[in-house]
């Protein structure tokens, strides 16, 4: 029997006051028993499923983001079936919304991406099903970081979000005092100006904004390197530094044209004082190479006093890097996913650790088959302390299982919730008990043509 969910506006005030969070109907019963044992326990939490609808091409996610919430007991029940695309709430965004949630799942935060409403921040009280009640007023941050801001919440008790952008200038050229003679011109550097805004998530207010020109070393700049993209701000354990991941690009100093055939440098992170957002410095890993800006999902997390950060486009396969309390990379910590998973070209697409230092990682690798939207994705269970990783074989992997746009995991104690489903195919919620590796197949997720699920919140 599949149980199909109705609108959660049917919840009574009494049920809400008791923290009981379910309202569903059964296919073979029209009379609801008020003592139904399926009523969840008082320690239940909301699990919000997000789906990205196809725009033009399968898996592009440009047709809008749909969200739908159920309680954690029903999320674990494979007889439950939900249809976010048919019954869900449309999260405001011109393209795929970039969502965040409170730690307890009771609030969804959204900043619209691109279009006329790009940069508009809204938050919603999660009330079950497709009922998301807007809280407070909108605030628009586009005047600070543009209409396509890259933002995440900071792990400070759901108080603050941070959004960033980078503006790359035209290459600086020294004309040697002869502006009409280009034969003696010398390339100097390409300036990248970053902007960072912090947002009061509780009161929908701008907290701070700063811009900086962030230099690399003189040698790196002379060779044409510059920050071309930044993302994924993360607080250190002390709460006095903000780490921002970055991607480097390069121009050919002899022509100032874009150079795609270059040596990939050690992974870099921009460090700012917090909350002032002043005094930018750059730190460099001697272990990992490539980018640290991630894509759609939070890319760095504080655990046990240090920040653990994934990198991407590493010639040796993705690493999980460690930044210690001294705000420098710990180059004695070497955790390489190629080695741990026995694959080539591992690429971390998204990940999330539990409080025990064990995490679920979404990844692809060089031998991933090419699906309808891109390379096939997988999930692995990793241990940050032991530096081990194991593919989670209990989750099915269709060739069209596409995780490049994956955003959300829910951590509930030592359990991590995730979504599975190939592009255009039905899937399920899965729950990984990180202590034991046990995997539970949960609620069915009904899909539509060309669309895919991008996580839970």
Segments and roles (model prediction):
Residues 52-61, 165-192, 240-266, 312-314, ...:
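Short, conserved, GDST-rich strand-edge loop motifs in beta-rich repeat architectures
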Residues 88-101, 141-157, 221-234, 289-302, ...:
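Repeated scaffold domains used in trafficking and secretory/extracellular systems
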Residues 346-422:
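Loop/turn-rich, solvent-exposed surfaces of beta-rich toroidal or solenoidal domains
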Residues 59-184:
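Post-signal peptide N-terminal segment of secreted/secretory-pathway proteins
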Residues 208-372:
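Acidic, serine/threonine- and glycine-rich low-complexity intrinsically disordered segments
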Residues 76-89, 130-144, 193, 198-222, ...:
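Beta-propeller fold detector
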Residues 63-73, 121-128, 181-205, 257-277, ...:
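Beta-propeller blade signature
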Residues 1-48:
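Bacterial Sec-dependent N-terminal signal peptides
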């Amino acid at each position: 029997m599949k149980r199909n969910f109705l609108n959660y506006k049917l919840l009574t005030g009494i049920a809400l006051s008791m923290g009981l969070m379910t309202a569903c109907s059964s296919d073979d019963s029209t009379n609801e028993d008020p003592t139904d044992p399926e009523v969840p326990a008082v320690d239940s939490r909301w699990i919000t499923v997000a789906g990205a609808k196809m725009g033009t091409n399968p898996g592009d996610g440009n047709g809008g983001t749909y969200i739908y919430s159920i309680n954690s007991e029903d999320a674990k029940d494979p007889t439950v079936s939900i249809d976010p695309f048919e019954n869900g709430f449309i999260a405001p965004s011109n393209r795929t919304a970039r969502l965040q949630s409170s730690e307890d799942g009771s609030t969804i935060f959204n900043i619209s991406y691109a279009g006329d409403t790009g940069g508009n921040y809204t938050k919603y009280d999660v009330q079950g099903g497709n009922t998301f009640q807007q809280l407070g007023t909108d605030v628009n941050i586009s005047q600070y970081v543009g209409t396509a801001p890259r933002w995440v919440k900071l792990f400070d008790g759901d108080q603050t979000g941070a959004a960033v952008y980078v503006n790359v200038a035209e290459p600086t050229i020294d004309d040697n005092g002869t502006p009409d003679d280009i034969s003696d011109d010398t390339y100097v550097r390409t300036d990248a100006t970053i902007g960072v805004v912090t947002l009061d998530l509780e009161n929908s207010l701008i907290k701070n904004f700063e811009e900086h020109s962030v230099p690399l070393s003189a040698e790196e700049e002379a060779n044409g390197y510059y920050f071309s993209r930044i993302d994924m701000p993360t607080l250190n354990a002390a709460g006095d530094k903000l780490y921002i991941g970055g991607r480097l690009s390069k121009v050919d100093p002899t022509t100032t044209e874009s150079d795609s055939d270059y040596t990939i440098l050690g992974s870099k992170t921009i460090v700012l004082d917090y909350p002032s957002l002043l005094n930018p410095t750059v730190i460099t890993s001697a272990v990992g190479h490539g980018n640290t800006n991630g894509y759609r999902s939070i890319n760095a997390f504080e655990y046990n006093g240090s920040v653990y950060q994934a990198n991407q486009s590493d010639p040796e396969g993705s690493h999980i890097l460690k930044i210690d309390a001294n705000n420098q990379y710990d180059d004695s910590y070497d955790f390489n996913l190629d080695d741990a998973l026995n694959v080539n070209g591992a690429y971390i697409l998204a990940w999330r650790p539990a409080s025990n230092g064990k995490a679920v990682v979404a990844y692809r690798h060089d031998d991933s088959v090419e699906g309808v939207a891109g390379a096939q994705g997988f999930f692995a269970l990793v241990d940050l302390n032991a530096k081990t990783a194991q593919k989670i074989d209990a989750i099915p992997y269709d060739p069209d299982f596409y995780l490049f746009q994956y955003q959300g995991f829910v951590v509930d104690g030592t359990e991590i919730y995730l979504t599975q489903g190939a592009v255009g195919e039905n899937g399920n919620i899965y729950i990984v008990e990180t202590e034991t590796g046990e995997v539970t197949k949960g609620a069915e997720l009904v899909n539509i043509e060309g669309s895919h699920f991008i996580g839970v919140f």
